[in-house]
Regions:
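DG-centered beta-turn motif at the end of beta-strands
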Residues: 169-171
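Binuclear metal-dependent hydrolase catalytic cores
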Residues: 1-167, 182-183, 241-268
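Cap/insert and terminal regions of metallo-dependent hydrolase folds
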Residues: 173-263
Length: 268
């Protein structure tokens, strides 16, 4: 099993050559399992995924949305409209608030947020809303969920093929005290993809924004005995020079760890 990185930025895309080594697009990852494609978030990176799928589209696409902030759903219409009509489409999420999943997806695919013309896509999309902490299957993959501390809520996913597993945990503010349930959720994962958006100094002035630091990611990885840690949801103002410095610090403290790069495949 390997995890393809189509976008690793947070909040908004980065622009310019100074950001090219770690990438410009916002959150989108994917993993193939037989004739299923599992997509984790659909930020602007989903547009790159859509282009890559054109020669060999999967029979089933299942999309896990951590939450509905723009940087995680901006590419959703482009991905959905790029797929053949015979592709089975499923979207899984645990949105907070009164609006249900189907209502939120319909809004993203409709005016005034998106031009008319893809209403048929919604009609063939199976929107599956799950309670926080739910477990379900996506083809041969087992999915577990865990609620995260983030404005408006967010969801972490643990994905397993029966032999290997990874945890995708973005848009969370690390707890002040160790959370046994959160540690248990990540326990023994082969790969932890974790929000590392803020430096410690940035976090001090942005408490409550719902993002984590390298320190917070390291604490979870160590407490949960995770095999490998990869930082994600990169600050869009952190250029390659800053990113290399942060990655070196992460690798120094936990050898084998790194920061996600757009276009790479993470072996699990």
């Amino acid at each position: 099993m390997h995890l393809d990185v189509w976008g690793a930025r947070g909040s908004h895309p980065a622009s310019g050559m100074a950001f090219s080594r770690f990438g410009h697009h916002t959150a989108c990852l994917s993993v193939r399992s037989g004739d299923h494609l599992l997509v984790l978030d659909a930020g602007t990176g989903a547009t790159a995924l859509a282009r890559a799928l054109e020669p060999n589209p999967p029979r089933v696409v299942e999309i896990l949305l951590s939450h509905f902030h723009h940087d995680h759903v901006m590419g959703l219409p482009y991905l959905l409209m790029s797929l053949p009509a015979e592709t089975e489409l499923r979207i899984h999420a645990s949105p907070e608030g009164a609006l249900g999943l189907e209502t939120l997806v319909a809004a993203i695919l409709s005016p005034p947020y998106f031009p008319a013309g893809i209403a048929g896509v919604l009609g063939r999309t199976d929107c599956r809303q799950h309670a926080a902490g739910a477990a379900f299957e996506a083809g041969a993959l087992d999915i577990r969920t865990h609620p995260l501390e983030h404005p408006g809520g967010s969801t972490a996913f643990r994905v397993s093929d029966g032999a290997r597993s990874f945890v995708y945990a973005t848009d969370l503010e690390e707890p002040e005290q160790p959370d046994p349930a959160w540690i248990a959720f990540a326990r023994g994962a082969d790969l932890l993809v974790h929000d590392t958006m803020f430096t410690e100094a940035e976090r001090e002035v942005r408490r409550g924004w719902g993002h984590a630091t390298i320190e917070g990611a390291l604490q979870l990885a160590d407490a949960a005995d995770v095999a490998r840690l990869v930082g994600f949801h990169h600050n869009p103002v952190h250029d390659d020079q800053v990113m290399f410095q942060r990655e070196q610090e992460l690798a120094r403290r936990r050898p084998g760890s790194g920061l996600a790069r757009e276009g790479e495949a993470l072996r699990i």
